[in-house]
C-alpha cells in the first residue's frame, strides 16, 4: 500500500528499549525511561504480522541497546514465525560475544554494529565507556556465527572525522562487508551535539579519489564506494528531500506508537491501547489494520523539494 506520495511501506523499525549501556554524546535518545511501557514479544510480533498485509517485509530492531532485552531471542523467533523475511538489528556490540550464537539460532539474519572509532581514547570520548576490545570481540563472534552481511555504523563528528580512513582500512582488513559513514543529524540529543557536525563533502571527495564509486542507491540516492573488498556507503539523511522521497520505513516505538517519520512528532498513531487490551485477537487485528491505514494516509516526507513558479504578464 502506497502513501499519497507514492512511497511503498516495506520496513518496520522497532525500538525495543530506551536503556543503553553506552552514553554516546549524540545518541538519538528517542525517549527517556522504559517504565512499564515495554511491549512483549507477542505484542511486537502481532504488530509486525498485520504490517505485512500493508507491505512490511523486513524488521530492524533498535534501541537504546536491543541486546539488553532478555527476551530478545524470543522476539526474533516470533518475528520469523509470522513470516518476516529479514530480521536485522543495530547494536553497540558489547554483548555480542555472548549473544551472537543465540540470536542467530533464533533467526536473526544480520547486524549493524555501531563503532565510531578504533582509537581507544576517542572511542571512550564518544561512547563514555572503555570497552573497545569487547566490541571488537563481538564483531568477531558475529562473523563467526554468520550474521552476514556484517555492517559497521560510523557517525561522523569532529571527534572522529580524522580517523575515518584508518577505520576503513580496519574494516577492510577485518573482513567486514560494509560500513556506513553517517552524517550527524539533530534528533534528540543530536540537537545539542550538532555543533560537532562535519560537512561530508570533503570525505566524499577523498572517497572519489581513493575508492571506486560503484552505484548510487536507487531509493535514497546514497553513494556507495568500493574500497578494496569493502563497500562504503555515505548516509546523509538530514534536510535531504531525496532521502525522504525514498523512505519506506515506519517505526514502532517502545511504548506502542506507530511513528511515521523519525524527524516528526506530529504524525503518530498510538496503538498501545489496542495491543495491550483484553480484546480478542481478531478484534486487535482489525483495529491494527485501521491504524496502519491511517498511518499510511498521514505519512509524508519531512523534507521536500520546493518548486518556485513565477507569473508573467
From Swiss-Prot:
User: In which residues is S-adenosyl-L-methionine bound?
Assistant: 64, 114
UniProt entry tagged with the keyword Iron: yes
Q: Which UniProt keywords apply?
A: 4Fe-4S, GTP-binding, Iron, Iron-sulfur, Lyase, Metal-binding, Molybdenum cofactor biosynthesis, Nucleotide-binding, S-adenosyl-L-methionine
Q: What is its EC number?
A: 4.1.99.22
Q: In which pathway does it act?
A: Cofactor biosynthesis; molybdopterin biosynthesis
Cofactor(s) the protein needs: [4Fe-4S] cluster
* Residue intervals of the Radical SAM core domain: 4-224
Q: Which InterPro entries match?
A: Aldolase_TIM, Elp3/MiaA/NifB-like_rSAM, MoaA_arc, MoaA_twitch, MoCo_biosynth_MoaA/MoaC, rSAM
What residues bind [4Fe-4S] cluster 2, as annotated? 244, 247, 261
Q: Which reaction does it catalyse?
A: GTP + AH2 + S-adenosyl-L-methionine = (8S)-3',8-cyclo-7,8-dihydroguanosine 5'-triphosphate + 5'-deoxyadenosine + L-methionine + A + H(+)
Q: Which residues bind [4Fe-4S] cluster 1?
A: 20, 24, 27
Q: Name one GO biological process term.
A: Mo-molybdopterin cofactor biosynthetic process
Listed Pfam families: Mob_synth_C (PF06463), Radical_SAM (PF04055)
Q: Which residues bind GTP?
A: 13, 60, 90, 151, 249-251
Textual note on the cofactor: Binds 2 [4Fe-4S] clusters. Binds 1 [4Fe-4S] cluster coordinated with 3 cysteines and an exchangeable S-adenosyl-L-methionine and 1 [4Fe-4S] cluster coordinated with 3 cysteines and the GTP-derived substrate.
Q: Which CDD domains match?
A: Radical_SAM
One example GO MF annotation? GTP binding
Functional note:
Catalyzes the cyclization of GTP to (8S)-3',8-cyclo-7,8-dihydroguanosine 5'-triphosphate.
Q: Which HAMAP family match?
A: MoaA_A
Query: Belongs to which family?
Result: Belongs to the radical SAM superfamily. MoaA family.
* Protein name, UniProt field: Probable GTP 3',8-cyclase
Amino acid at each position: 500500500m502506497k502513501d499519497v506520495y507514492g512511497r511503498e511501506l516495506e520496513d518496520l523499525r522497532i525500538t525495543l528499549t530506551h536503556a543503553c549501556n553506552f552514553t554516546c554524546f549524540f545518541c538519538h535518545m528517542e525517549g527517556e525511561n522504559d517504565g512499564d511501557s515495554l511491549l512483549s514479544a507477542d505484542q511486537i510480533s502481532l504488530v509486525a504480522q498485520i504490517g505485512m498485509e500493508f507491505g512490511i517485509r523486513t524488521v530492524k530492531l533498535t534501541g537504546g541497546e536491543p541486546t539488553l532485552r532478555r527476551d530478545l531471542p524470543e522476539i526474533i523467533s516470533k518475528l520469523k514465525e509470522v513470516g518476516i523475511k529479514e530480521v536485522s538489528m543495530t547494536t553497540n556490540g558489547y554483548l555480542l560475544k555472548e549473544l551472537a550464537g543465540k540470536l542467530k539460532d533464533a533467526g536473526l539474519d544480520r547486524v549493524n554494529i555501531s563503532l565510531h572509532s578504533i582509537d581507544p581514547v576517542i572511542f571512550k570520548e564518544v561512547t563514555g565507556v572503555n570497552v573497545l576490545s569487547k566490541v571488537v570481540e563481538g564483531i568477531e563472534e558475529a562473523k563467526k556465527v554468520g550474521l552476514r552481511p556484517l555492517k559497521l555504523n560510523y557517525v561522523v563528528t569532529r571527534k572522529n572525522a580524522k580517523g575515518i580512513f584508518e577505520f576503513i582500512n580496519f574494516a577492510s582488513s577485518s573482513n567486514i562487508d560494509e560500513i556506513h559513514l553517517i552524517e550527524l543529524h539533530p534528533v534528540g540529543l543530536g540537537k545539542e551535539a550538532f555543533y560537532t557536525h562535519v560537512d561530508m563533502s570533503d570525505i566524499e571527495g577523498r572517497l572519489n579519489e581513493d575508492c571506486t564509486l560503484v552505484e548510487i542507491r536507487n531509493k535514497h540516492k546514497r553513494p556507495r564506494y568500493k574500497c578494496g573488498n569493502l563497500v562504503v556507503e555515505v548516509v546523509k539523511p538530514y534536510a535531504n528531500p531525496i532521502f525522504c522521497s525514498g523512505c519506506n520505513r515506519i517505526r514502532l516505538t517502545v511504548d506502542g506508537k506507530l511513528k511515521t517519520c523519525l524527524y516528526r512528532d506530529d504524525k503518530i498513531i498510538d496503538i498501545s491501547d489496542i495491543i495491550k487490551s483484553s480484546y480478542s485477537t481478531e478484534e486487535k487485528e482489525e483495529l491494527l489494520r485501521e491504524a496502519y491505514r491511517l498511518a499510511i494516509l498521514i505519512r509524508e516526507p519531512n523534507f521536500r523539494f520546493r518548486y518556485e513558479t513565477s507569473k508573467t504578464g
